[in-house]
């Protein structure tokens, strides 16, 4: 099979393909043209090292550059080995993305280990390879490309920007409490007196660590491997420290001035910094992008960001730590964040285990009106510091104007964009937090500076989330706010620490848009959930049942195995059905009855609750106001 390394071989390959096509056409003039056989580009032919002994970054970049020059479908293939990818010679691009570091110029240049850019009909097939990324970099990206598939490989980071410290033992010696921590390989550290400095792997180029931090870093969550639960909480490891001793073998003893024996043996303290300096993977201005049959063992600094793209599919991807690593964290923050995507988002048959934020978040962005330079023109601004620097609108897009206080559309609320002057997503020559947008008609009456937000409703997807498993999640399971049809079906949620499914629409904090109009939650299982299990909470300050924010939510044929929690808490919904569901108690009917009402509604109408099965001892009250 041709590998695209020899010009002569390539010419013969192309000629043979043309000849076969002509022969097929001669025998059947009306037949459709056969699919063009893709050119195969093997990264090993460019010097990539599947033994994992040397840096494969330059070779992988060279293979991708060659693949880009091939004017036909292409498969980029790896051997079934281990490839090391360092950031020093990775492709570098100035990029801005949603929910990361906004316009912060310290982080504008992103290193990308595997970059598909301005390409069409390309498959990156790992063939069972493992890609090990070093330092702070994005594992892979698709930028301005179409028909892109990433498949059949695992990726991990040699030194994750998270420390998973397991409390191996606790005790008391001479009246002083102590803990012994076990630290996974890939988390270098140095003991300095009564402190620990965490060192994020040494760069071979500079001799300095890629990142560093002290003691509990900036954020902690706690994982209980036995109970299979993870939650956000305080970090007691570095309080009242008397001494820190490196015992060797990646074990650290911390002695305390206090006397009470710590009661947290077996727990894992997952500690990290808070700057989301780059996404783990990035899909931007691309169409028909698929991630399939992959192990995402860790996502550095953030998750997979899909941004202003069309049709994204994630199928059979294990977002979970490598079981051989000794780690319990698989993402610095979210696993999947879809921002301003159109077409269809499909997330199926995947595992979400061990994030530091929400596994799936699908939303748009509200831009706030900050100026009216003309009758048909507005100045709009990003309002959350983590999101800035990239375009939100293009000529031809349809927008909707909404009032912040009510979160409902203005009268005559839609217009079409005709011109945009704002950030490009790739450079800092223009202001990164504001843009001027011109529409095809005068802006509607009622648009107010500081009181109106604008959403790009062209860049909203239909969504299918099916057949997935969510566990060891410290936050919500799924966040979704899109006006297109959403189906959440056949998923298993176990031990969520916040709402399993959360629907917001937020014009006050995160500015994540917008309303849902057709949401079906069907055939899922919710086990050991926190309450409320399904939480609808738009940020409207004025609540009027006659003008709800969200519409047409159906919860049907699901099973809920719960403690004493509320199943549904919904605000500002017009049309909510809860039918054919089974709600069971976790502790059995011989225990005292639960007191939490199963259903709470605020400012909602069209509520239908019917044909459900409830265990005895549940509070089936429906609370409305």
UniProtKB/Swiss-Prot annotation:
Keywords from the UniProt entry: Glycosidase, Hydrolase, Repeat, Signal
Signal peptide residues on this chain, from the entry's feature table: 1-32
Placement of PbH1 repeats on the sequence: 342-364, 460-482, 483-505, 516-537, 573-611
Cystine pairs: none
Highest taxon listed in the record's lineage: Bacteria
Keyword flag Aminoacyl-tRNA synthetase: no
InterPro entries xrefs: Beta-barrel_GLAA-B_II (IPR056441), PbH1 (IPR006626), Pectin_lyas_fold (IPR012334), Pectin_lyase_fold/virulence (IPR011050), RHGA/B-epi-like_pectate_lyase (IPR024535)
Matching SUPFAM superfamilies: Pectin lyase-like (SSF51126)
Pfam families: Beta-barrel_GLAA-B_II, Pect-lyase_RHGA_epim
Keyword Hydrolase part of the UniProt annotation: yes
EC code(s) of this entry: 3.2.1.n1, 3.2.1.22
Reactions the enzyme catalyzes: Hydrolysis of terminal, non-reducing branched (1->3)-alpha-D-galactosidic residues, producing free D-galactose; Hydrolysis of terminal, non-reducing alpha-D-galactose residues in alpha-D-galactosides, including galactose oligosaccharides, galactomannans and galactolipids
Similarity section: Belongs to the glycosyl hydrolase 110 family. A subfamily.
Function, in words: Alpha-galactosidase that specifically removes branched alpha-1,3-linked galactose residues present in blood group B antigens. Has no activity toward linear alpha-1,3-linked galactose residues.
The name this protein goes by in its record: Alpha-1,3-galactosidase A
